[in-house]
UniProtKB/Swiss-Prot annotation:
Organism per entry: Rhodospirillum rubrum (strain ATCC 11170 / ATH 1.1.1 / DSM 467 / LMG 4362 / NCIMB 8255 / S1)
Designated name of the protein: Putative membrane protein insertion efficiency factor
Keywords, alphabetical: Cell inner membrane, Cell membrane, Membrane
Extent of the signal sequence: none
Principal location: membrane
Amino acid sequence: MRPLAALSQGIGLLMRGLIWLYRLFLSPLLGQNCRFDPSCSRYALEAITRHGPFWGLWLAVRRISRCHPWGGMGYDPVPDDPRPGRCGCKDAGPAVSAGSTEGNPGRRTDGTDPD
């Protein structure tokens, strides 16, 4: 394994570990306040796993910055390509509303997956 790849893998593992510690100890005290599905911590874990620690952190920070009462809400998946302008999403726009199936026709309006 190349040194840079090993460093990236180690940083990603550390970041995922910190998120799991947050989910285990701090999140139960704060309650479920996230306005998005998946929750911000699940989103961050998936983004780091799929895109590595650097792009994953960028996506997680962008998502957490939108998670406030005046921000968006609803279903907001991790994009396939995190590079700006290539994810097929609007950077400043809100996520799809919770009752809508727009952008994900396989998802039911009650928030459950069809199977």
